[in-house]
């Protein structure tokens, strides 16, 4: 079962253990060296210059869905933040078809972005299902205040290695490629990042159909159940040239 951390237990830890427990991951977002065609194939030369992909981790053992690997890479340039997901999936499913449908109930890949870490509780959410349908919002308190937000100019492409909503066969997986123009972050950050800037983010995946459904995630939110909306536990994106 997913570990639940109790404050009373910290006295039993070695001096360095608490620091290690609370650390968040860091990813260096390289500048794209060539144009990126957002087609879901992830075969542009620019992706070869990205830092090695992060692999999302499984933290909640009470979930019964299959543990299917997800790897994520990121790049940036003067126009946008680029995100590439590669998700193993033996049964690709997605029912929702309209913008701002609850895509998180489908097979979905997500990125949460906070461009101003001084405002720890605020972040943008981009959640895309295997059909390429986007649910986006601006969250102000990490629990209940999800503000309607419609990003503009976002490029989205998925590529399926299998068939959608066909449970009788076995699929291999799917990829998602995103380009999010910097203008979409202006409410929290008036200018694009520069080399050396640090933003906060988390990368998540919802996979499977209830009751066999599982979440995987980049940065551990230290929650006893699968809840990714903990901006104080987001990992760090460091923009580099």
Listing of model-derived features with the role each one plays in the protein:
Residues 1-11:
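Bacterial N-terminal signal peptides that target proteins for export
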Residues 11-20:
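Hydrophobic h-region of N-terminal signal peptides that target proteins for export
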Residues 21-241:
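Structural preference for beta-rich elements and adjacent junctions enriched in aromatics
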